[in-house]
């Protein structure tokens, strides 16, 4: 297995690619072979994207009462959880959060809203906030506003949005087990519309939903076909009141193996570890960078708390990682 892993890394660095069958086979590595996989992912990462780490932060700008029935989500109106419920926050609050993210060293700041989409006055308010963030900070703003079309993407871009975030969440073959209120193709179409508008796309998913290892590979190959710019990787933090409240936690080793395989499938992309990092990786959080990740979210998530920012910044320094600074 060590020879196979090394051969795959050499092939990728030389401009080739890993096959689906090889990627699925790598999901089964155990023992010391896991470290061979991590070494290969690190070599590929350093060849294609270097040794810098990209930091991002978000604001939950509109929370709760979402009509979608995503099995993992605390904000779904189909679930009874303790997640906060409030309308779209004012632009001043978005701007203040962007400034805080900038102070903490994030290069990207995401405005995230619950619900299927945004339009009308809400969209106009977000457009105004984007213009102010661009004018009054150096941070790059992104948005995650649900399913949108090319015209909306162009409006957001003109207002200053750098990247649009829209997760596929899981593989197409598993999606009906997670969400039935919209089709997988709606998400794929959103990614394509945003790309057509000339906007960078941040698109990934969440692991530990009950999907198979092969389905994790399936989603990675879909992301490769869509040619997304960055891939956020979340790991399920089961929330009481959701359909997945009793789901078994994904192991730390499974998290790291999945990151490594995604690096081999998506060698030149930004791979950012986001939600569930603290819950699932615990003392192994720093290992994400040895498994192939080159980004992480700092601060809090949508409905769960993140780790202390200073603790994360110390971790990056201890690892000798250089953080990417904000720049328009």
Swiss-Prot record:
Gene3D superfamilies: Aldolase class I
The protein's required cofactors: [4Fe-4S] cluster; [2Fe-2S] cluster
Pathway: Cofactor biosynthesis; biotin biosynthesis; biotin from 7,8-diaminononanoate: step 2/2
Annotated Radical SAM core domain residues: 48-277
Cysteine pairings via disulfide bonds: none
Residues spanning the membrane: none
EC number, as in UniProt: 2.8.1.6
Catalyses which reaction(s): (4R,5S)-dethiobiotin + (sulfur carrier)-SH + 2 reduced [2Fe-2S]-[ferredoxin] + 2 S-adenosyl-L-methionine = (sulfur carrier)-H + biotin + 2 5'-deoxyadenosine + 2 L-methionine + 2 oxidized [2Fe-2S]-[ferredoxin]
Tree of life domain: Bacteria
GO biological process per UniProt: biotin biosynthetic process
Binding site for [2Fe-2S] cluster: 142, 202
CC cofactor note: Binds 1 [4Fe-4S] cluster. The cluster is coordinated with 3 cysteines and an exchangeable S-adenosyl-L-methionine. Binds 1 [2Fe-2S] cluster. The cluster is coordinated with 3 cysteines and 1 arginine.
Residues annotated for [4Fe-4S] cluster binding in this entry: 66, 70, 73
MF terms (GO), sorted A to Z: 2 iron, 2 sulfur cluster binding; 4 iron, 4 sulfur cluster binding; biotin synthase activity; iron ion binding
InterPro entries associated with the record: Aldolase_TIM, BATS_dom, Biotin_synth/BioAB, Biotin_synthase, Elp3/MiaA/NifB-like_rSAM, rSAM
Matching Pfam families: BATS, Radical_SAM
Keyword terms of this UniProt record: 2Fe-2S, 4Fe-4S, Biotin biosynthesis, Iron, Iron-sulfur, Metal-binding, S-adenosyl-L-methionine, Transferase
NCBIfam families on file: bioB
Family statement drawn from the similarity comment of this UniProt entry: Belongs to the radical SAM superfamily. Biotin synthase family.
Known partners and oligomeric status: Homodimer.
Reported function: Catalyzes the conversion of dethiobiotin (DTB) to biotin by the insertion of a sulfur atom into dethiobiotin via a radical-based mechanism.
UniProt-listed HAMAP family: BioB (MF_01694)
PANTHER family for the chain: BIOTIN SYNTHASE, BIOTIN SYNTHASE, MITOCHONDRIAL
Protein name: Biotin synthase
Species assigned in the record: Citrifermentans bemidjiense (strain ATCC BAA-1014 / DSM 16622 / JCM 12645 / Bem)
